[in-house]
Amino acid sequence: MTGAQVNIVIAAGGTGGHLYPAIALAKEFQRQDRENMVTFIGSGKQLENSILAHEGFSVAHIHVKGIVGRGLWASLKNVCLLPKAVWQSMKILRDRSADLVIGTGGYFSPPVVCAAALLKIRRIIMEPNAVPGLANRVVGPIADRVFLAFDGAKHYFHEAKVRVVGTPVREEFFRETTARQQGGKDTLLVFGGSQGAKAINTAVIDALKASSIMRETFAVIHQTGEVDHERVKAAYASSGVDVEVVPFLYDMPQVLQAATLVVARSGAGTLAELAVCGKPSILVPYPHATHNHQEHNARAVEQTGAAVVILEAELTGQRLAHEIERLMSHPERLGEMGAKSFAGRKVDATALMIQECRDLMNAMV
């Protein structure tokens, strides 16, 4: 199958954290051969549809809901949806003549990966977190390959299947630019993942109100998420703080490259993008992530010296302002953090995954 057209189906839905690493992989498949066809399977959520449409990919939908953290009755009801979701997935895979199925974790992956196994289609899973989620642990035994970002996650899977390669990052993040200054100011980028984070939003608002140093030092770009956008925008307006407030940044590669300092969640995709761009960061892990994987991710980066971690339970405007002022008063430390972030990047994750996928498909011919 070397050099031949391949039809790829990717189970990746819900949030940008699941979507963007898969999009990076999909784009590289299509860059190598324009005839390669990629279909995403997702939930039909507005943000997901918007991201995929913006990136130029088609999406099919299956009816499935999460199980972890839903309560006993809801979990049992949602388990009952799985057989139908597997059947729906099998129909999509047949209709697309799928040669390869990629699962990215989350509750969309198991039905699609199981359907691929039943149809004897090659299947791989991507696990970008330091502690694998339940979905990938469940389908790990039937996956042909398991791609990891953290070496410490290896013991959750069969050793022969595991490849530690990093997290795919879109090619746009590798285009070098210099940190942008607006009116002589550095750029502070704030985002709480693709859906935003109310706790981070509130802390940044309070920090900017309280800290004249922050207001004088930074031009602020703040991705709020759709739900919290109007509240945050109104709060800045009432306080007279000049901030660029947007619900979602489709041009994140350009904006992140231009940032001097970043305040963000610690999803695996975000951490990979920060490393590629060599950005120092203040990380606020999402406290309700399955198996607390965001804190594990953040601590791993903190140990390298590339980030400062503030737990959400400890996050206030005063604490955030203190950390930001401390970093900006020691530019040499900020530079060291950026250098250590850059040193942790893995530039060949996408290429390694694609080569492994091609080897798998060639082995079936």
In which residue ranges do the predicted regions lie?
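Conserved nucleotide-sugar phosphate-binding/catalytic loop shared by glycosyltransferases and other
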Residues: 5-13, 34-81, 226-228, 313
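C-terminal alpha-helical cap of glycosyltransferases
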Residues: 346-365
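Active-site-proximal region of nucleotide-activated glycan assembly enzymes
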Residues: 36-37, 58, 117-176
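A short, well-ordered alpha-helix in the C-terminal region of glycosyltransferases
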Residues: 333-347
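Donor-nucleotide binding loops and adjacent catalytic segments primarily
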Residues: 46, 51, 55, 178-262, ...
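Acidic donor-binding loop of glycosyltransferase active sites
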Residues: 98-100, 257-271, 279-280
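Glycosyltransferases and closely related glycan-assembly transferases
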Residues: 88-101, 109-124, 137-141
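Structural loop-to-beta junction motif characteristic of Rossmann-like glycosyltransferase folds
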Residues: 57, 121-122, 260-261, 278-286, ...
